[in-house]
Amino acid sequence: MAKRVAIVGAGVSGLASIKCCLEEGLEPTCFERSDDLGGLWRFTEHVEEGRASLYKSVVSNSCKEMSCYSDFPFPEDYPNYVPNSQFLEYLKMYANRFSLLKCIRFKTKVCKVTKCPDFTVTGQWEVVTQHEGKQESAIFDAVMVCTGFLTNPHLPLDCFPGINTFKGQYFHSRQYKHPDIFKDKRVLVIGMGNSGTDIAVETSRLAKKVFLSTTGGAWVMSRVFDSGYPWDMVFMTRFQNMFRNSLPTPIVTWLMARKMNSWFNHANYGLVPEDRTQLREPVLNDELPGCIITGKVLIKPSIKEVKENSVVFNNTPKEEPIDIIVFATGYTFAFPFLDETVVKVENGQASLYKYIFPVHLPKPTLAVIGLIKPLGSMIPTGETQARWAVRVLKGINKLPPQSAMTEEVNARKENKPSGFGLCYCKALQSDYITYIDELLTNINAKPNLFSLLLTDPRLALTIFFGPCTPYQFRLTGPGKWKGARNAILTQWDRTFKVTKTRIVQESPTPFASLLKLLSLLALLMAIFLIFL
């Protein structure tokens, strides 16, 4: 009899988990507390409890070729950066294509997940759910938690002296939907992540004045990168990743700063990060520099004091009149349906091996999918996690001894720099390609560049020097997709299809053959260094 797997949440990771279970012959049941799939990507006019919330104008920060499921490309006529409404349609197409809807129970809240009395023998879980006010209990052989980390707003009011005296309006960015409420108002946005920056820029079109307060600064990138290419298709390549990871961290940090400043000098705009030794997730926004240079958005330091109708910033004695404060101060994550002994969260970190498995369980039958912030797209990350996790749940792949897993988790929490490559500032951040390759290696699905160079050199060159698109993860191993090679070789065609809407006659490039030869030599040298 097939193992029964309970999946909590029908967002991008939940859908991938359902599909992976079906591919491995398991019996998944997905519980979704809302009335539709999509999680974060389903816009609603009102905030729903226990579900991520987005604003009407949200567009993906990762382009369609980099953020699709590995065996299901976005439609070629979709824009490279996808608005939330089209992203939701894509998720629905994915669910229909692989018959996932039959496994989802909508309007069903997971109340409690507990180990069965004989857990040490069976590894089973009791899952208590609630549908239309009625509670039910069922036994499952495994559980996959796919609830994400954008549901519990972090609102540190204690850090803002005088906030209780403020007579204006204030709220967390989770509540933001449209900019209309800011018309002719003086607005302060606290926090310079992607949401805070988006809200400040969007608000500046209607507001009287907009301040964006940041404590540590941030690198700001445009989605439009070198030569007009999508940023992640240029930045996320195996060649660049190997190059960065082979250099000392100070050199990589200097190169990163130089690249970030090639768009505009961050110091001249008051944005340069105070701590440049550790990489904080860059902010993706195409308009912020223009808003700053035209005076629509003013960058300010942290808040010293909030008064009845104004605020005082640190190092600036002048009071600034404020009508509305938006706290874009991020989120905390928790698992209210799980006992703390199962997944313990301390200081914003969970003791999960490879960000997936609790290290102390005698039976590895619970997996957390999507609780990670890679410098890359979440969909292929969560999908690859699910592919490996399902094979562990099924017993095909084995985990290391508990001592080895604990040692790795503790090392990650300490976040000690290795001295090479990028050093990330948060425990939930990771090197996208390195992390994906670790998981692919566990299921024997990592592409073998040396072998491909001998049998399919065109594909090998594209994989190594081109963008690390998710199709690479389906070239071999379990779940191999016969369309992967073609998807890789045509990825730029789909990218340009929606931008080249006016055909221009191009002159031939005289050095094209030379560049190809140099690329081949560089690949051979890289492979030589790898196997040295």
UniProtKB/Swiss-Prot annotation:
Belongs to the FMO family. One of its GO terms (cellular component) is endoplasmic reticulum membrane. Pfam families: FMO-like. Coiled coil: none annotated. It is found in: Endoplasmic reticulum membrane. It is a single-pass membrane protein. Signal peptide: none annotated. This is Flavin-containing monooxygenase 1. Liver. Keywords: Acetylation, Endoplasmic reticulum, FAD, Flavoprotein, Membrane, Monooxygenase, NADP, Oxidoreductase, Transmembrane, Transmembrane helix. Broad spectrum monooxygenase that catalyzes the oxygenation of a wide variety of nitrogen- and sulfur-containing compounds including xenobiotics. Catalyzes the S-oxygenation of hypotaurine to produce taurine, an organic osmolyte involved in cell volume regulation as well as a variety of cytoprotective and developmental processes. Its cofactor is FAD. Residues 2-510 are lumenal. Residues 532 are cytoplasmic. It comes from the Eukaryota. The record marks K208 as: Important for substrate binding. GO terms for biological process: energy homeostasis; negative regulation of fatty acid oxidation; taurine biosynthetic process; toxin metabolic process; xenobiotic metabolic process. PANTHER family: DIMETHYLANILINE MONOOXYGENASE. The keyword Metal-binding does not apply. It comes from Canis lupus familiaris (Dog). The gene is FMO1. Disulfide bonds: none annotated. Its EC number is 1.14.13.148, 1.14.13.8.
